[in-house]
Amino acid sequence: MHHPKETLLIDSSNPSYSHLTEYRFDNLKREESRSTSLFGDRRRVMKILSGFSLIIIVVFIFATSHEQALSTTGDLTSSTQSTTHGGVVFTYPTTRKSPGKGCVLNSQRSTPKNLKQYTGNISDACLAGIKSSNCKTWLMTNAVILKYSDDVVSNCPSILEFVNKTSLSCSGKSQIQYMYPQSDSASSDCNHSYDFNSNALNRAIYNFNYSKTLISTSYANTPGFAMYTFLLKIMNCVNKNGIKLDAGILNIFTDMTYIDLCESDVFMSSFPDTLNKLIEAGYIVKFYFLNQNLQDTQKNVENVLAGCKYMNSRSYCEIVDWSYHSENPNEFEICIPDSQPSGKKEDFNWHVTELLLIIGIPCISLTICCIAFFVCCLKCAKLKMAMMRMNVFSNDTHQNPDEMELKKRWIGMRKKFNKDVENGSCKELNTQKWSHFASANNYMDIQALANANKKDIWEIDTKNLLVQEDHLLGNGAFANVYKGIVKGKIPLLVVNNSLNMTVESENNGHYEAAIKKLPAHADEQNHLDFFHEIDFMKRLGHHPHVISMLGCVSNPYEPLIVVEYCARGDLLKFLRRHKDYVLMNKTDDCPIEADMCLRIKDLVSIAWQVADGMSYLASKNFIHRDLAARNILLTKSLTAKVSDFGLCRYMDSALYTAKGGRLPIKWMSVEALKLYEFSTKTDVWSFGVLLFEIFSMGDVPYPTIQQVDMLEHLLAGGRLSQPLKCPNEIFNIMQKCWAEKPEDRPEFNEMRGEITVMLNLDDESYGYLSVESQGGPKYTQLTMQDSKETAPCSTPGGSQDMDEDGDYDSGSEGHSQGTCAQLDQVLTERFGEEQKKEIKQIFCEITSKSMRGKRRQSNSTVSTYQS
């Protein structure tokens, strides 16, 4: 919100604008923009493509070198003592505790009897990370047993993520199951196996209970025995169900140390036999020790887990460091149907790869260049086709007869439109005739549209326009409004040469203006909508209570709309700023700190002006769709002007149906919320909400109702309550506006007439109006919702005397003529010649009807008396 004191003052006839040079649109720095020719920057395009190709080469070489390094690492053995493995540096702590008293490691501990040995032939077994056509369907059993509750929250999500990564290739024919030490029943986990990619699996993962993964508190001091019972449970499950698919893998995730396992004699004695049975059942087993580095203690770990190999993926039981899996997920992947191994490439041939690099990179670069060239040609072809369709945008003098005919139609319709605007007779404007010239057409190019408007009479030369980008008047989602100055005669007065308009902000041929422009992030659709708004403002015409466009700049990259400057900003902020400065009585004094104070009469006057502006829009068959206090602007003299026509549409039928977009929910009627149907009657509903905003001094409508509940609230009969400062007569109009059926709502010209009657044109006292009624010259008043006592006031024109009955007499019939004469003078001084006639006609008709009614009543009384 801007303040009147911030207005730029121009004292001299030729003011200096040197301090605003950076805001000029004719500034060379701002005029420079990227060339529209896609072939003008061939060198730059080629440099970009060359750099892109170079990046691809570097990345490819790095990836290949990394893969070669991994392939030459070979199988890991238990004798490796290095602190790194496969290029991965381990950062986890070695163990959580030192060896206990009950742990005795026997270096001569042998592997279990009859344990299968991998022979090197890939057809003998289904292993993780190996592609095989015989290993398409898998049963993945994930056993999670954790000891430390502090790490459960971090360990469980990482386990789920690992399982997801290693089973991406599994189809719905493969199955997965989870097993925990604390299950609801002994066989519950065993009976729950889920197909991959099923809703049941998704629900199971969503309902994953971390607490089930912890060992029982009774096993807190004997974690090795807990592992024994857990493996026994898994083995019983295997004996019960078996593996009916091509292969099976058992992933055991634990944060126990090998020392915890070693301290349990039961585990140490039973593990070899348990492992042998699991392998004979068709499982390959992998132990994942979470948050541990077993590099330095791999011999001890292999001794505890007899038959398992440390970091050897080609064994039936593998001991895995948890830190290694994230760097090499392919080595643990299952359900790979091809015959080629994915984890480690056999017989890697660097010379073949080098040859592929030499041949492939140039081919890829050439392909990219061809695609870029094709895209450039396609865009240029589309641009030429658009310009051929709209031949009026071409400066070529050699045109065929069809092109000349289309150009003549364009020029003829433009001249007719300008002539109708000058004569004020453009009410019957048919937008369908302008359909292939309108800026909202999707096929029109923005550049061509801008070229069409360059020689338009509404255009402002950028040399005569200064934009103060450091003086932001307002901003929204799709546009920013800045203060600016227009030099010379404004296009609005050129188009409407008969318009005798006085601009408040004019000073020696320089006009203060509000300049609307698109933000930097605006896309092509925003530009098209902006040009649509420019076209709408041209067709809108001039009205004292509707914001007028002074001119425009049809720059395709930075179009501008120049409108009237309203010093007091939007009505909503104005009301909230003066919320505490409303004088309820004539004798009240305005506080010293207030820049101005308002009376109820001022609020009624603003409401009348908005109704007048909306009546004009309705007469032009325009629907606003966003009538609210935030979109009403106030000039320095408190003249209200309807603005913001971004959602405004031309109504060529009884209803306009919206197709989407952002809409003001709490200002919308029932049919607009329910069916997205808009008409003048929906604007009437919004006008009722606007009246609530005015007389509540800027309160938010329906503050306790959510937007999604608005339709239900309105259908249930919910409406806004009467504001404290709202007269009963105004609230009656508001209630009429909120009728559920559109046909029951009043027209804007009807409401304008009612508010005209309410306006006190002769008395500045608060709350009292002088009007004529059908029953004779009586005195009515604006009554507040909590007022009990009222007082009369004088009627415009003439003097009144109180008769014996306490009624006011307005005099003879000749007094009506005196009233209209005085009313004529007051209207001319207050509202100008343009609005005088309509208001005068309303008052005179009311006076004439009341006098005729009085005569009929008098004659009827005399006849009754005589009879």
Swiss-Prot record:
Region spans: Disordered: 782-821, 848-867
Ranges of compositional bias, category Polar residues: 858-867
Localisation per UniProt entry: Membrane
Protein name, as recorded: Putative tyrosine-protein kinase F09A5.2
Family according to the record: Belongs to the protein kinase superfamily. Tyr protein kinase family.
Listed GO CC annotations: plasma membrane; receptor complex
Organism listed in the record: Caenorhabditis elegans
Source taxon at top rank: Eukaryota
InterPro entries according to UniProt: Kinase-like_dom_sf, Prot_kinase_dom, RTK, Ser-Thr/Tyr_kinase_cat_dom, Tyr_kinase_AS, Tyr_kinase_cat_dom
